[in-house]
Structure formats: C-alpha cells, structure tokens
Amino acid sequence: RTRPLPFNLVLGISAEEECMGENGIRALLPALGKVDMALVGEPTGMQAATGERGLVVLDCTAHGRSGHAARGEGVNALYIALDDIARLRSFHFGRESELLGPIGIAVTQIEAGTQHNVVPDTCRFVVDVRTTDAYSNEETVGILRAALRSEAVPRSTRIRAAAVGGEHPLVKAAVAAGRETYISPTTSDRTLMPFPALKMGPGQSSRSHTADEFVLLEEIAEGIAVYEKYIGKLAQEYGWKTLG
C-alpha cells in the first residue's frame, strides 16, 4: 500500500533575487497556475521563518543654496539632511505589527559637496526602510515624506511584508518537525508570493551577500532530512490519502 501526498509538489529554482529583474520568481509564478502555499528555501539554518519585513529604499535629496563658506552665505543642504537624519533616528510610527514588530529605519549612504569652501546646495542620502504589515508600503512612504524637509523618492514599493499565522498548516508542520519559528529580518522571494509561504532552507543567512558565499555539505544533508520530515508532517496536517 502506498500513501501519496495529499497535495502536488512543484520545485521552482530561481537565480534572480526579489529586488532584481523580471526573470526570476516573477516570471515563474504566472506559469504555475493556482498555488495554495509555498516553502522558500532561503538559508535559515533549517529553522522556520514565519514572516519577514518588506523593504522600501528611499533616495532623499535636501535642497539648499550655494554660497562661500568663509562669508557664511547660502543655505547648507547638508545641515538640512542632518536634521532629517536625526529625525529618522528617533522616528516612531503610531502602529506596530503584532507579528513583525516595529518598522526599521537606517540611513546607509550620504553625499554632499565638491569643495571645502563652498556651502553645498544639494545633499543626497539613502534610507533603508524595513516595512511591516502595520502599514502598506505606500502609507509608510507618505508618513516619512511628511516628516522630512528633504525630497524622498522610493525606488520601489513592491517588496512587501509577509507573515503566516501560527495556526496555518505550514507553521504547525514546522513545529511538529521540531523546527523553531522566528521572524526573519531579511527579505526574499517570499515577499512576491500572493499566498501563504514559509521560509526554511539550509545554510546561514549571515553568509548571504558575502565574499565566497557558501553552504556546507553537511548542511545540505541535514536539509534533505528535515525537508523529508517536514513534508511528512505537512501531509499529516492535510490527511494522508491511501490507495488500496
């Protein structure tokens, strides 16, 4: 007697990240038809990431007026930017996600001026915003724009926060398989999936985007064993089919 799985499994392998081009998961999903749920194989140490924050990158520009530094002329765009950056460091949103926690804000780049004796009329800085389901990405951008003197332009608003609740079979199966659940601080293709998904895969997220990024062979072996156990637990959640 055999026990086929009570669902179909489709393996999708994508080489593009969620923030890159259109030939990765964006091209794959329309070809799959209806999808009920997904398991995303990003490196998590084979623990179960039940949610992840979204991402909005803001290109900000402070506008001033050029002048000679010795004569105290002009309006220093760098100072305007610094005031905005200080405001961002202590900024708090009115709502906080129960699953994903607070929205994260980090200024990661700044550029101003070309000469030591000229007051800069422009200062550009970049803000990395890790969004949650407490606000849409568009709402988050609007709130931050209202708080800043600088112009703020989002590169994209499509990388959205995502989470799956503890009562979903994806999560219940992970717990039954002995996996710890947590909220991932990083984004993945999960954010582009309009259906419940869990992130769990071999390797360590701390190695991502580093020189000579790698996954150990023993981590792959562990991953295979965990996936087998997990799929079995997930099948139990949906009820095994038995053929006589």
Model-assigned labels for residue ranges:
Residues 1-57, 61:
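Acidic/histidine-rich catalytic neighborhood of metal-dependent amide-processing enzymes
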